[in-house]
C-alpha cells in the first residue's frame, strides 16, 4: 500500500476559506476586508494587470502539464467555414439569388473545413502509435467554429485529446464541442493567448482566414525571423490562395525580407501534404 504522505503541510486557500467561513466579516468591515486573492474588484483594477497576466499564463500551463501535453500542432483559419454537410443544407434552403450565392460560396469553402478535419485525424492516428504521452502531438486551436472546430473535430472523433484557447469577445464566442473537457481555456488578453499558442507549438498550419488568421500567422513568422523562438514549419494550406493574397516573392524582390525568411514556409494543397511536412521535419517515421 502506498503511503499517504501530504505534499506539504499548508492548507490551500480554498480549504482555508471553507474552514473559516472565508470573507464573511467583509460584510461588516467593508470591501477592504476581503482576502486579496478572493476580491474580484481588486483583481480587476488596472494596477493589478501584471498579476492577471501571470494568472492567464499559469492556469493553462499547469493544466497542460498535468495532462502530460508537451507538444502541440496549432491550426489557424477562418471561423466562418462550415462542413460540407452543413453547406449542402444551406444550398438546399436558399430561396433567392443572394442566398444561393452565399450558400454556394460556403459549399466551395467547405473543402477547407473537411481538410482541417482530416488533418486532425492524421495527428490523432500518429498519437496512437506513441505509448509515451510526452511524445504525442496534440491539435490546438482558437477553440471557436470553422477551421478551429474542424481540426479539433478530426482529432476528437479519432479519440484524441484536443485543446482550445478561446478568447472573451464583445460578441461572445463559445468553445466548439470537440475540445476535450478540461482543455478549453478562456483568455481575456490576446497577448497571453498568443503566447500559449507558441509555447508548445511544433508546427503551425494555416488555412485561409481573415484578420485574426493573418495576425496569428505573421506573429509567428516575426518571432521566428527575430529568433525569439526556434524555427518550426509554417504550413499554408491552399497554395494558390496564399500566393495570391500575400506576395511573399514581392517582399523578397523588394528586399523587404530575406529569401531565407521563407525557408520555413511551406505551401500545400492537402492535409496529407501538410502532415508529411511535419512528419519529415521531426523524423516521425
Predicted regions and their residues:
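Glycine-rich beta-alpha loop segments
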Residues: 2-3, 18-165
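C-terminal amphipathic helix plus adjacent low-complexity
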Residues: 4-8, 13-18, 279-285
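Solvent-exposed alpha-helices and their adjacent loops that cap or buttress functional pockets
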Residues: 65-68, 130-134, 156, 176-179, ...
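Short, solvent-exposed amphipathic alpha-helical segments in soluble enzyme
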Residues: 90-92, 156-157, 219-224, 250-254, ...
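Residue-level recognition of the N-termini of beta-strands and the immediately preceding loop/turn
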Residues: 135-138, 231-233, 262-265
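Phosphate/pyrophosphate-binding betaalpha-module
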Residues: 140-207, 211, 218
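Short, acidic/small-residue loops that bind anionic groups at enzyme active sites
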Residues: 159-172, 207, 221-245, 259-260
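C-terminal functional extensions of proteins
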Residues: 236-285
Amino acid at each position: 500500500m502506498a503511503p499517504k504522505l501530504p505534499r506539504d503541510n499548508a492548507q490551500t486557500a480554498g480549504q482555508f476559506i471553507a474552514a473559516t467561513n472565508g470573507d464573511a466579516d467583509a460584510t461588516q468591515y467593508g470591501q477592504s476586508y476581503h482576502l486579496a486573492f478572493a476580491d474580484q474588484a481588486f483583481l480587476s483594477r488596472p494596477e493589478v494587470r501584471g498579476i492577471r497576466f501571470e494568472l492567464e499564463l499559469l492556469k493553462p500551463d499547469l493544466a497542460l502539464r498535468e495532462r502530460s501535453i508537451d507538444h502541440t500542432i496549432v491550426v489557424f483559419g477562418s471561423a466562418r467555414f462550415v462542413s460540407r454537410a452543413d453547406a449542402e443544407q444551406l444550398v438546399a434552403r436558399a430561396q433567392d439569388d443572394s442566398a444561393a450565392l452565399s450558400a454556394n460560396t460556403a459549399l466551395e469553402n467547405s473543402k477547407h473545413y473537411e481538410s482541417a478535419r482530416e488533418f486532425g485525424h492524421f495527428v490523432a492516428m500518429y498519437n496512437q502509435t506513441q505509448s509515451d504521452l510526452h511524445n504525442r502531438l496534440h491539435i490546438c486551436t482558437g477553440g471557436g467554429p470553422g477551421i478551429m472546430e474542424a481540426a479539433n473535430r478530426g482529432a476528437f472523433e479519432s479519440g484524441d485529446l484536443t485543446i482550445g484557447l478561446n478568447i472573451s469577445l464583445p460578441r461572445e464566442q463559445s468553445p466548439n464541442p470537440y475540445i476535450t473537457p478540461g482543455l478549453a481555456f478562456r483568455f481575456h488578453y490576446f497577448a497571453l493567448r498568443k503566447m500559449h499558442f507558441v509555447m508548445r507549438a511544433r508546427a503551425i498550419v494555416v488555412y485561409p482566414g481573415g484578420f485574426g488568421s493573418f495576425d496569428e500567422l505573421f506573429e509567428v513568422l516575426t518571432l521566428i525571423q527575430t529568433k525569439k523562438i526556434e524555427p518550426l514549419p509554417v504550413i499554408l494550406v491552399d497554395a494558390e490562395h496564399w500566393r495570391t493574397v500575400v506576395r511573399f516573392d514581392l517582399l523578397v524582390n523588394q528586399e523587404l525580407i530575406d529569401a531565407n525568411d521563407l525557408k520555413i514556409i511551406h505551401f500545400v494543397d492537402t492535409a496529407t501534404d501538410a502532415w508529411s511536412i511535419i512528419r519529415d521535419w521531426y523524423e516521425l517515421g
